[in-house]
Amino acid sequence: MTLLLAGDIGGTKTILRLVEISNSSELHNIYEESYQSGDFPDLVPMVQQFLVKANIPSHPEKACFAIAGPVVNNTAKLTNLVWFLDTERLAQELSIPFISLINDFAAVGYGIFGLNKQDLLTLQAGKHQPEAPIAIIGAGTGLGQGFLIKQGNQYQVFPSEGGHADFAPRNELEFQLLKYLLDKHDIQRVSVERVVSGQGIVAIYQFLRDRKLATESPEIAQVVRTWEQQAGQAEKTVDPGAAIGKAAVQGSDRLSEQALQLFIDAYGAEAGNLALKLLPYGGLYIAGGIAPKILPLIENSNFLLNFSQKGRMRPLLAEIPVHIILNQQVGLIGAALCAARL
């Protein structure tokens, strides 16, 4: 058994986990702690405190940390922290010979292989091809995209900035949304991330509200107004995207329901765009924090219709397996599996 250290490092919260991996690549969780990232000047003292508290007889041989941000030449700077991480320094100061830093969405790609059947909800079984590419897409704070290609006996994960590709409206309402966003932000183009993300849910809500396409309820109106008044502030006291999503799931707010319908349609269409580019018959996995929270809406929506509505390419997309990842610790699992490869 090899002892591994896995970390999921965010600007607000960091989760550390000690894992043992068997010869059959089975993961066994040993110890886990969650920390407020801002309470520490650097990752090193946090890990040192964690290892002391874990009180284990042996020391991790390998470590991998998933970072909420870009990783360049084995270094990373987190947006909301003063931390600057470098694998060479971390290895020296933590006495862990093998350390890797990976983007948090790349960690999701690795984590797919550590999921169980109950960690997934299959929207479309398709016709799985074991040697084919795998695609991942995930709406959360932004819109992550990536893909995996099989190389030998293992898959290699490739990150992508596909979320910053252009939003492509497909009907009159979406064209109106595009023009609304162009005018509102005085910009020349709209990325798909501005629509398919947590911020996108709010933008769609504002569009429907300002165009008076549905009546606004006092409860959600108050949340959105508070958020709008706090624009530009580092700390916000409300999460309008979550409030809109919850109201839509509960069926308590018609404007929120319409906003989520438009959001899910655009999400399905963009997932289909990614699928067209990669033909991921190994599966397309929907990650991110939003999908699991709005499952009833997705299951009873036109997500798959919009996913597959690609003209004469529709029969190809009908054969691609589509899964929603329910396990929100998939990134931490991926970091552990990535560490095992070092």
UniProtKB/Swiss-Prot annotation:
Subcellular location: Cytoplasm
Enzymatic reactions: D-glucose + ATP = D-glucose 6-phosphate + ADP + H(+)
UniProt key word Kinase: yes
InterPro entries named in the record: ATPase_NBD, Glucokinase
Major site of localization recorded for this protein: cytoplasm
Family of the protein in this entry: Belongs to the bacterial glucokinase family.
Protein name as annotated: Glucokinase
The organism of origin for this protein: Nostoc sp. (strain PCC 7120 / SAG 25.82 / UTEX 2576)
Gene this chain is encoded by: glk
